[in-house]
Regions:
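Nucleotide-binding/hydrolysis machinery
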Residues: 1-23, 27-35, 44, 53, ...
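Conserved alpha-helical scaffold flanking the Walker A/P-loop in AAA+ ATPase domains
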Residues: 30-31, 81-103
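Short hydrophobic/aromatic beta-strand immediately N-terminal to the Walker A/P-loop
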Residues: 38-42, 103
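Conserved glycine(s) of the Walker
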Residues: 48
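AAA+/P-loop NTPase substrate/partner-engagement loops
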Residues: 63-86
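Conserved D-loop-proximal element of ABC-family nucleotide-binding domains
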Residues: 78, 111-113, 178
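Conserved P-loop NTPase "ATPase switch" module shared by AAA+ and STAND
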Residues: 96-113, 118
């Protein structure tokens, strides 16, 4: 069921995986696809959090125009207030009665003032546009350890509880090296098609090097390989 659900993703390399961790991740994402429960995506940089946010939005049945991405690192409190309020309102290109997906990218980057603003807009983990019916689903992403951030007083516990209805943990590439050959083939085919060239084949020596490397940039780093 989950494999069929994820078969049409635009960039399947980020959600494909042979291991148990990726299977569990994809099954859980498929189970919550039609709900409005807040989702927190946790993973290192380059593990595909942005791709998963768009995937969750698409699987929810919401229209493409109703996805609003907010870069939390780039906003002060006033800007965040305007951005989030605008995202929570129905724009002209969103059908009447359709709920939006608001993607808070890098939510751990919010300072104390921004956290207060967001907390005031998420009274119970979802936004209600002046009515009892939710108008938006919130998906957040982070690359940090929230437990440490909360303990250090850098992130509000009550806000954490309101954005983590379900936590999806994206494993780093070094923990799923069995997927490297298939992931790389996907990217090489993509690059070759863009350049209108034949897809190259990897030598045995090249494969050994790929498996020996720890990939600190994760799948994003792998995707940049050109042969």
């Amino acid at each position: 069921m989950a494999n069929q659900t994820f078969a049409y993703v635009t960039d399947p390399a980020f959600v494909y995986g042979q291991g148990a961790d990726m299977h569990s991740l994809n099954v859980l994402a498929a189970e919550i696809e039609r709900t409005d429960i807040p989702v927190l995506l946790v993973g290192e940089s380059g593990t595909g959090k942005d791709v998963y946010a768009r995937l969750i939005h698409r699987l929810s049945g919401r229209g493409e125009a109703s996805l609003a991405k907010i870069n939390c690192a780039a906003l002060d409190a006033g800007q965040l207030l305007n951005e989030v309020r605008a995202a929570f309102q129905f724009a002209g290109d969103v059908a009447e009665g359709e709920t939006r997906t608001v993607f808070l990218d890098g939510v751990h980057e919010l300072d104390a003032a921004c956290q207060r603003v967001l907390l005031s807009l998420l009274p119970d983990g979802e936004c209600k546009n002046g009515s009892a019916k939710p108008t938006s689903r919130v998906v957040s992403s982070t690359s940090c350890n929230f437990e440490k951030e909360i303990e250090a007083g850098r992130f509000r516990l009550e806000l954490y509880f309101r954005i983590n209805g379900v936590i999806l943990r994206l494993p780093p590439l070094r923990d799923r090296k069995e997927d490297i050959p298939d992931l790389l083939e996907c990217f090489l085919v993509k690059h070759s098609n863009e350049l209108k060239k034949n897809t190259p084949e990897l030598s045995r020596e090249a494969r050994k090097l790929l498996f020996a490397y720890d990939w600190p940039g994760n799948i994003r780093e792998l995707s940049l390989i050109h042969i």
